[in-house]
A protein has these predicted regions:
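Conserved glycine-rich cofactor-binding loop
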Residues: 7, 14-15
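Short, small/polar-rich loop/turn modules that mediate ligand/substrate recognition or access, typified
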Residues: 87, 173, 178, 236-238
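Short C-terminal tail/terminal secondary-structure segment
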Residues: 146, 226, 237-252
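Active-site helix of classical SDR
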Residues: 121, 157, 165
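Substrate-binding pocket helix/loop in short-chain dehydrogenase/reductase
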Residues: 97-110, 206
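Residue(s) in the substrate-gating loop at a strand-loop-helix junction
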Residues: 141
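Alpha-helical segment proximal to the catalytic Tyr-Lys
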Residues: 126, 170-174, 234
């Protein structure tokens, strides 16, 4: 059990990739805490994990609100102690017109998809520095490398995560803290399914360009994230891990 007794905190852990990460790190022996906006689903998942013999703790929280994340951090550290590994997974889609999007909408979106990465890191880093060890995995997206029309400003936020990851990796490496990014391609999560419902033509379009002829399952992304949290990845720092089945290798 490569994460035995390690406290791993996952944002947006009640669904999608986050849910798969919570399960996978729990299976690896971690004490896993997670937050989510969906209180009912979060509590049910916590109960499910505990019934299976895992150490799990759920607390509700909106990553886009700093005070809520401060409360979340206080709750999870009270339950399991300092955070050893952080997975910044929470986020949402955006489909704005760059002219019609309001400043308030911009701020609300960026608070969730970009600023929250820094906020959670800021909360967890002091203990990691003191321990001279820690791991952070930031979930970006293949949209940081290439994107679709009418997806503004999702790609901007996901690209920003890569720069933030590099900054943190360079600054925190001397403290024994590794910071990496994961860039999933199309993954069959509720958020992606929601996108396909709103844009049904995109499902067949997405499948048509997939070199492997399918999309990823959340657990396939989670396995890489878990690896990056373990000592098996002890010299992996500041890296961008693209997990897209080869999609980004296409020219057209």
């Amino acid at each position: 059990m490569k994460l035995k007794n390690q406290h791993i905190f996952v944002t947006g852990g009640a669904d999608g990739i986050g849910r798969a990460v919570v399960q996978d790190v729990a299976d690896a022996g971690a004490k896993v805490s997670f937050c989510d906006l969906n209180i009912e689903k979060g509590k049910a998942y916590e109960a499910e994990l505990k019934a299976a013999g895992h150490q799990a703790f759920f607390t509700p929280g909106n990553v886009g609100v700093v005070t809520q994340m401060q409360d979340v951090h206080a709750a999870i550290t009270k339950e399991f102690g300092d955070v050893n590994g952080l997975v910044n997974n929470a986020g949402r889609n955006a489909y704005y017109d760059p002219v019609e999007m309001t400043e308030a909408e911009w701020d609300d979106f960026m608070n969730v998809d970009f600023k929250s990465i820094w906020v959670t890191a800021k909360l967890c880093l002091p203990a990691m520095r003191k321990a001279k060890k820690g791991a952070i995995v930031n979930i970006s997206s293949i949209h940081a490398r290439m994107s679709y029309p009418n997806y503004f400003p999702y790609a901007a936020a996901k690209s920003g995560i890569l720069g933030l990851t590099r900054n943190l990796a360079l600054d925190e490496g001397k403290h024994g803290i590794r910071v990496n990014a994961v860039l999933p391609g199309f993954t069959l999560t509720p958020m992606v399914e929601d996108y396909f419902v709103k844009n049904p033509e995109k499902r067949s379009e997405a499948l048509s360009v997939q070199p492997m002829g399918r999309m990823a399952q959340p657990i396939e992304i989670a396995k890489v994230i878990t690896f990056l949290l373990t000592d098996d990845a002890s010299f992996v720092n500041g890296a961008d891990w693209i997990i897209d089945g080869g999609l980004s290798g296409r020219f057209a």
